[in-house]
């Protein structure tokens, strides 16, 4: 009787693993087969979207959020990954949408024009006032923006932001943070970078658990002393990738 029960458990476990693997394969295929803007594809070499999505465990049909979506590079990647049965929230604060004379607002509007990416919902609102129910999102991610919160507004604001993300996630949900690596003694505000040790400290002080960190976007040739928009660095900076999890 015990042997039969153990065999059943092993089979069930194998089925779940297979479903997860096939689900991830479908997600990667969705992205690779998608008709995406040429400008986005040029950035793929440095951003490795399929590798990142696979690392984060995004599944078809998931409800996800691109936090501080800017012009929507990752919004589009996520939209193709989760498929027609999924939902992507593209969040930008009103202040961010006014930046550079409305550049991000115009770029995101163009990206979603004529019903492109029908599974994307714009949230032109602050994280503290999203207007959606709490505990309803499977995964949220923010890419190359977290440094702006910490460098401009400080530790308390960064922790408050993380708490806002925590609130919108389902139990067991994932929060991914990608950013340009800075140094402890560098002018990270001017360089648009984030000291990795500081990020780890913020994670430790937040409600999240550190689930994993990835080396997919690391570049040892970047010594962290140059601005991220410098021609020889732009699109190819050394970047950390953290996968945080809200406890179940």
Language model features: what each stretch is:
Residues 79-80, 156-171:
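A short glycine-rich, Lys/Arg-flanked "PGG" loop and its adjoining helix->strand segment in the class I
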Residues 61-70:
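Conserved class I S-adenosyl-L-methionine
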Residues 172-180:
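Conserved beta-strand signature within the Rossmann-like core of class I S-adenosyl-L-methionine
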Residues 112, 187-213:
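Conserved Class I S-adenosyl-L-methionine
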Residues 27-55:
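Class I SAM-dependent methyltransferase Rossmann-like catalytic core
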Residues 100-130:
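S-adenosyl-L-methionine
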């Amino acid at each position: 009787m015990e042997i039969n029960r153990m065999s059943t458990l092993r089979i069930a476990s194998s089925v779940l693993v297979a479903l997860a693997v096939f689900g991830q394969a479908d997600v990667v295929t969705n992205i690779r087969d998608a008709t995406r803007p040429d400008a986005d594809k040029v950035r793929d070499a440095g951003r490795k979207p399929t590798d990142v999505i696979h690392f984060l465990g995004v599944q078809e049909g998931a409800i996800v959020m691109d936090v501080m979506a800017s012009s929507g590079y990752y919004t589009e990647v996520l939209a193709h990954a989760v498929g027609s049965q999924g939902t992507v929230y593209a969040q930008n604060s009103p202040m961010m949408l006014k930046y550079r004379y409305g550049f991000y607002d115009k770029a995101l509007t163009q990206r979603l024009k004529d019903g492109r990416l029908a599974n994307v919902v714009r949230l032109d609102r602050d994280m503290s006032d999203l207007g959606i129910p709490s505990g309803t999102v499977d995964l949220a991610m923010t890419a190359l923006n977290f440094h702006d919160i910490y460098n401009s507004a400080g530790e308390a604001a960064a922790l408050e932001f993380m708490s806002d993300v925590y609130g919108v996630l389902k139990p067991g949900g994932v929060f991914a943070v990608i950013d340009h690596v800075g140094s402890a003694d560098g002018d990270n505000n001017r360089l648009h970078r984030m000291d990795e040790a500081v990020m780890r400290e913020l994670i430790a002080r937040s409600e999240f658990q550190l689930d994993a960190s990835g080396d997919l976007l690391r570049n040892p040739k970047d010594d962290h002393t140059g601005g991220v928009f410098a021609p020889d660095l732009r699109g190819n900076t050394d970047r950390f990738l953290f996968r945080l999890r809200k406890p179940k």
